[in-house]
Amino acid sequence: VAETVSKIKLANKPIPFPYRVHDQPDEDRLIPFVEFARKYGYHFQTKTPEQIANSFNEMLSKVQGLPEQRVLEQMGIRTMAKAIYTSKNIGHYGLGFEDYCHFTSPIRRYPDILVHRVLTSVLDGDPIVDKKMEQKCLHCSERERAAMETERASNKYKQVEFMKQFLGDEFDAVISGVASFGFWAETVDHKCEGFVSATSLLDYDDFIYYESEYALIGKRSNWAFRIGDPVKIKVISANLSKRQLDYEWILDLDFKPAQNKKKKK
């Protein structure tokens, strides 16, 4: 409430203000995701931003507790623009607010302080016109990204450190990412992500990356390694200095990779 009320105080005043904005989904990212979600039976209306938001909410509600929940949630997040701080208000698409800012939180951020200063000056009848507000917002956004990258690096380090004890062990996993040079898989038990190189798959087939399918597909076997697919992996390397986990795909006698549904041309 405080965050939206604070903006009302400034509604008709041309005062530089640190908004928290979130742009609409990028079409280039959205279309592949919509096609991917359709494979699981989820259909999107994309003519207007409101339809897109409603379709996302409907999917997120229906997918709860289903095997594809994690992959669709992760892929959905990746289609979204990143929220940033700026003095140029475009609204917050994700929250559905035309005007939004960060006022306070369990921790007090520097952007919160910027908001407090402007509001205090307005309430005191002597508004601050900070000509460097956009520069400060840019700095806040950059430091936020740096903090998130540091957090990811720290989490990855602890994952690698933890998985060192399991070298040579096999685990059930789920494919969490795919590229032309291999795929990433996250263990079901520990949520630790490692990489399976496409080179290590050459004994089985020559796999080609299909971006629209989010999949590596075998030339001869037509096997498909697709985001969200369950796999069996072996931990083969845990490099702390590089914060890197390497896995090897294990061909389970009771399991075969999914067959690609598209006919090969």
Feature names for model-found ranges:
Residues V1-D189, F195-S197, L202-Y204, I208-Y210, ...:
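Append "with occasional cross-activation on large, charged helical scaffolds in nucleic-acid assemblies
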Residues F171, R220, K232:
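Eukaryotic intrinsically disordered and solvent-exposed regulatory patches
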Residues E213-W223:
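Short beta-rich binding modules
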Residues W223-K264:
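OB-fold/S1-family single-stranded nucleic acid-binding modules
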